């Protein structure tokens, strides 16, 4: 049988050297020397061949907008202790004053071509949904999702960056985003002004997710405040709503400041809810305790 592609002398992460046979867009065999011919052949020369990259959290609607962002926003977000995170987000949100759908599509296309070149196969793409961005970012990402459907798997997240309770009109726009075809319900509950409103934020997201049978991805506790508890409420809500294994918590930086007793209880809850955690180590000085999460059996 003629194969489409054979990658010879590939080194797996285990250190094993083997041939990888590809046909009809799928890996057919990983093993010793592959006999027969192939339409294409690559000699990996003993170098590492591994899985494609997955970007689980990317604000794709905002790529290549650095010229619009103020330096003060970056300084606040990366500051010691991350006490100015909310101010940084509010300052950076001014980029949405420049939102034009066609321009977003053009910027995103350039980034996706580069991502594809570097081996990215899947992206969970966040698009701001609020009274400033309205549906512009979502519409742009839905168009680019279709354009790249045979190249990169893109999930569009309807993301209420500026809150739901504190930003009247956003809840309706989230429903409209899902009607347009967004894949995932987003959230950022800690951005709300009170703990009560943070819980309402999460409750609304679950109502929307259940209506559209959609997964949930939220930015939780993304500041240097050890009193933040939205990761806990998100996990308990996943259990209560029967959304086990369908929820992701991104950033969750405040967990780095939790005392050991509470952190262990939180890990047990996250595992029970099968909540995945996205660490985003390239942004901000605080990070989730990755090793502790992995040791607790949580997907990171």
Q: What kind of feature is each model-predicted range?
A:
Residues 10, 25, 46, 57, ...:
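Divalent metal-coordination and catalytic microenvironments
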Residues 64-104, 181-184, 212, 230-248, ...:
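Active-site gating loops and adjacent loop-to-helix segments of metal-dependent hydrolytic enzymes
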């Amino acid at each position: 049988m003629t194969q489409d592609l054979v990658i010879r002398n590939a080194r797996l992460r285990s250190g094993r050297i083997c041939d990888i046979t590809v046909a009809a867009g799928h890996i057919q065999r990983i093993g010793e020397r592959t006999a027969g011919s192939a339409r294409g052949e690559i000699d990996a020369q003993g170098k590492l061949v591994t899985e494609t990259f997955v970007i689980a959290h990317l604000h794709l609607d905002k790529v290549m907008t650095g010229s619009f962002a103020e330096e003060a926003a970056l300084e606040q977000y990366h500051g010691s202790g991350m006490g100015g995170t909310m101010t940084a987000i509010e300052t950076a949100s001014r980029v949405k004053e420049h939102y034009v759908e066609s321009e977003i599509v053009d910027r995103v296309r350039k980034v996706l071509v580069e991502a594809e070149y570097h081996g990215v196969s899947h992206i969970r793409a966040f698009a701001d949904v609020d009274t400033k961005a309205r549906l512009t970012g979502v519409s742009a990402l839905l168009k680019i999702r279709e354009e790249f459907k045979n190249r990169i798997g893109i999930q569009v997240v309807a993301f209420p960056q500026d809150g739901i309770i504190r930003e009247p009109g956003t809840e309706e726009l989230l429903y409209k985003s899902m009607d347009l075809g967004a894949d995932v319900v987003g959230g950022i509950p800690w951005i709300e002004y009170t703990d009560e409103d943070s819980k309402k934020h999460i409750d609304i997201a679950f109502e929307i997710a259940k209506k559209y049978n959609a997964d949930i991805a939220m930015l939780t506790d993304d500041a240097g405040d050890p009193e933040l508890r939205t990761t806990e409420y998100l996990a308990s809500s996943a259990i209560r709503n029967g959304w086990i294994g369908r929820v992701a918590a991104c950033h969750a930086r405040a967990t780095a400041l939790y005392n050991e007793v509470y952190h262990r209880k939180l890990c047990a809850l996250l595992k029970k809810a099968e909540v995945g955690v996205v660490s985003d180590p390239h942004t901000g000085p605080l990070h989730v305790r990755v090793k502790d999460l992995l040791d607790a059996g949580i997907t990171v």
